[in-house]
Regions:
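Beta-strand/loop substructures that line and gate deep hydrophobic ligand-binding cavities in soluble
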Residues: 6, 80-135, 144-146, 166-167
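Short beta-edge strand/loop motif at the mouth of beta-sheet-based domains
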Residues: 2, 8-9, 15, 19, ...
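Conserved catalytic core of Hanks-type protein kinase domains
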Residues: 23-24, 65
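Pocket-edge structural micro-motifs
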Residues: 52, 75, 158
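Short, flexible helix/strand-to-coil boundary loops that buttress conserved ligand/catalytic motifs
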Residues: 24, 34, 75, 137
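Short, highly charged C-terminal tails/helix-capping segments
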Residues: 135-167
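Hydrophobic pocket/interface hotspot
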Residues: 20, 30, 48, 62, ...
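Hydrophobic-ligand binding "helix-grip"
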Residues: 31, 38-39, 55-104, 111-112
Length: 167
């Protein structure tokens, strides 16, 4: 969901809050659902960098690391053509137990600082990756992230941002 300059996603995931938290802060777990390589320093002030798709890098800095309830970090892309430099947006992930057995977690992700079509692009991206996270926390494996996006408006926006389309 897009609300002003923010993208907001809420979902219930299988697994404890600690297990879900680790999916964001352990490089081996992170690349199971988002990215193909990762270098993470999950502590306040620590940096992260991961390759989302071949040649596309996301970078940021951890602001709050409060396992297993909250993770806040800055976010941006190393490619200046994408229009969102590292540190110019912020992601706030909160986790809370859901259900009576402690084996489900309510995740709320709020990504702020996204103006114009960046909100639409990141809403699409988070939707895709959080679905992959749900598959992995449910005991499955996530399929490889598609290199090509389905045809449509988002494809045109991605190509335009990457400088691959003049339209």
């Amino acid at each position: 969901m897009i609300d002003g300059d923010a993208v907001i996603h809420e979902l219930i995931l299988p697994g404890s809050a600690g297990q879900v938290f680790d999916m964001f802060t352990d490089a081996r777990q992170l690349i199971r659902w988002i990215g193909i390589s990762a270098d993470l320093q999950p502590r306040p002030g620590g940096r992260f960098r991961f390759e989302v798709t071949p040649g596309q890098f996301c970078e940021g800095q951890y602001v709050i690391v409060d396992r297993p309830v909250r993770l806040v970090f800055t976010w941006g892309w190393t490619d200046p053509g994408f229009g969102l430099a590292p540190g110019t947006s912020r992601v706030d992930v909160t986790l809370a137990p859901a259900g009576d057995d402690g084996q489900q977690t309510r995740l709320r992700l709020v990504h702020t600082g996204l103006t114009g079509d960046l909100g639409l692009l990141h809403d699409d991206g988070w939707s895709r990756f959080l679905a992959r996270l749900a598959a992995v926390t449910g005991g499955g494996e996530s399929a490889a992230y598609p290199r090509e996006r389905p045809a449509g408006r988002l494809t045109a926006l991605h190509r335009q941002r990457a400088g691959k389309d003049s339209s």
